Amino acid sequence: MSLLHIAVILPLIFALIIPILYRFFKKIHLGWFVLPIPVVLFIYFLSLISTTQSGNTVIKTLNWMPHIGMNFDLYLDGLSILFSLLITGIGSLVVLYSIGYLSKSEQLGNFYCYLLLFMGAMLGVVLSDNLIILYLFWELTSFSSFLLISFWREKKASIYGAQKSLIITVFGGLSLLGGFILISLAGDSLSLHELIANASEIQHSPLFIFAMVLIMLGAFTKSAQVPFYIWLPDAMEAPTPVSAYLHSATMVKAGLYLVARVTPLFAISQGWIWTITLVGLITLFWASLNATKQQDLKGILAFSTVSQLGMIMSMLGIGAVSYHFEGSQSQLYIAGFTAAVFHLVNHATFKGALFMITGAVDHVTGTRDVKKLGGLLTIMPISFTITVITALSMAGIPPFNGFLSKEKFLEAMIEISHANVFSLDTLGIVFPILAIVGSIFTFVYSIKFIMYIFFGKHQPNALPKKAHEASILMLLSPIILAVLVVVFGLFPGLLTQSIVEPATTAISGMSNVNAEFHLFHGITPAFISTLIIWILGILLLLTFSYWIRLLHAQPTRLTLNHWYDSTGKYLPNYSANMTNSYVNGYVRDSLVIIFGMLIVVTIVTLLSVPFDFNFKDINNIHIYEIAILILLIIAAFMVVIAKSRLFSVIMLGVVGYSVSVLFVFFKAPDLALTQFVVESISTALFLLCFYHLPNLNRYNETRSFKLTNALISIGVGLVVIILGLIAYGNRHFTSIGEYYKAHVYDLAHGKNMVNVILVDFRGMDTLFESSVLGIAGLGVYTMIKLRRKHQSSEVKSDEQAEQ
């Protein structure tokens, strides 16, 4: 096992150990025991930067189930190390922050167990090379995030948010699994880097488009893109450390990682480029618009997170256009990848800090309601400084890092509207328009976030707690992030060569990537767009009280949340009614549905798939065989029309004995003897049972009832006959009987082939069948014994009552 494997497994192991430590060290905050884990992992991944910076990749294999191609393979390149550093780096700061945020009276054992479980799952997602292993870790992130969001399970809103996130992300996970299976079938491999290497062949597969759609669904649900974004605002009911971790740097970025990782596979598709870019931009616009009307600080950050995720998603779509050009023109669109990678880091820094400050404000004032907050500038000066730096970075104001990636984003959007491919040079004009409008509202909610907390009139009577500055433990992590916002804004070169360029190379497949970010590079269309954003943003701020009423006037019934809640309300009743319509307690009705579907599926298959009948190897039919068949048919018909149960059982026995005679004709004496014995026993049991059964009324059967029975019976008979003839006439493989003939003696040392097959070749099958019969027999015996005890107890009670 390599160090890379240990890095993934380590948080999962400690997730099991930490709750045990909590029992013995309750006087010490459990976070101090957890903190070294992400710190050590962060240092380890930092040591690997030199490897990925030089263009090398690391592949580590650990055999698990190699016979089905399912191994614990890890793949480290510039993209995966970027996400690994975010997961462990932000994770370290979140754990440090949680020590000040969560008191010792909380269920810290559970909290840190869930947090480490999530951290290990995220590392597994970004480092796994095997598609099935990646999917398992993907679902583990959904499960662990459900536990984290519902941590305060006494609150109904927490349970509701956790359930919603689980339902939507698991739906995406199932779609993702389907996409992975299809793409692995198309590429004949479960290895992600092998599939990317064979992208040119996979793109011609008929499964390509279906795999692409399913994988996009998985990515969109995880990264909260329109229309699946509705789970993220409700997930804000989680403790603030969870929100700062999951919704700034980790879980919501998993979908972005997936899109970036599989871009080399799907970038050739016009549908991929248009869908990824357009969905991202619509998400940016819609979420930024909704963020402006939120009355809860976390609500603002939730929708701002959705909008920023849409922004990064659209950048990845723009970058995919580079696969259709070469040379300098390709470099123009690779700027989309570099902007996406750089903004991934920038968003983690400023959004993580903003979540932590929001938690600090909530912690010291007791509320996040913007109507009750305000005037905290002099009371919380350190928090104010951090908020100004990070919120202005989110708004795209220099000299902070958010401005640099926003400029590159606008530059890429303007360039794409001139691309002479997939009609982007005509229809692509919608891209920069959506980008600019979304950025205007981003500017508005970023400035309003500062004003809501620190400006206006202080209302001490409206606050549940007396406001004061947060503790140093709660401020240390956001201070570090705010410093990084400034440093990366002034010195972007610290990231470009070590992080941005290797990650961009991993996505684009080009080795000569040159990522450059400058605070000012002349009067360009992107800079002019920025000026427009600032001017219109200021105008909207000045007229905020007028136009915000229009947003609040939106009918609730037109929202996606209303549709989600309505579906959750009515779906169980609808499903129950549908189920009750065919699962009504009548065996006959269930059989009609089952056999009816069998007939329909068989007919559709026969009409769509060519087949033929081949009778060349069929032996001659003798007169005595025809006689037995006629007897069998007559007996079966008499079973159906019999008026007496006794006569029906006798005719059923005739059917069974006729089959045993046919086995004798076909030279299968063992089968004939078995059939004869079974038929004799079953007939005797039937007669014994019927002797004890009460007389039942015979219901009048309608004509439609009889007609349905007749059609189903005839249909099933024809299906079995046709399938049997087709199977006989279309033998594409050597009969397995030849294998048994060749090895029945030398492997099993037996001469009776049937017995050897049952006892040796299919011995386990026979054993389990016998076990099932034994269990059924025990069940019947238990029921009879309990009935006898019940009857005897009733007799005793009656005797005592008489006495």
Curated annotation (Swiss-Prot):
Subcellular compartments: Cell membrane
GO (cellular component) term, any one: plasma membrane
UniProt KW keywords: Antiport, Cell membrane, Hydrogen ion transport, Ion transport, Membrane, Sodium, Sodium transport, Transmembrane, Transmembrane helix, Transport
Alphabetical GO biological process terms: proton transmembrane transport; sodium ion transport
UniProt membrane topology term: Multi-pass membrane protein
Record-annotated membrane-spanning stretches: 1-21, 30-50, 79-99, 117-137, 166-186, 208-228, 265-285, 300-320, 337-357, 377-397, 427-447, 472-492, 522-542, 591-611, 621-641, 646-666, 671-691, 707-727, 764-784
Major place of residence: membrane
Cysteine disulfide partners in this protein: none
Keyword Transmembrane: yes
Family the UniProt entry places it in: Belongs to the CPA3 antiporters (TC 2.A.63) subunit A family.
The name this protein goes by in its record: Na(+)/H(+) antiporter subunit A1
Organism annotation: Staphylococcus haemolyticus (strain JCSC1435)
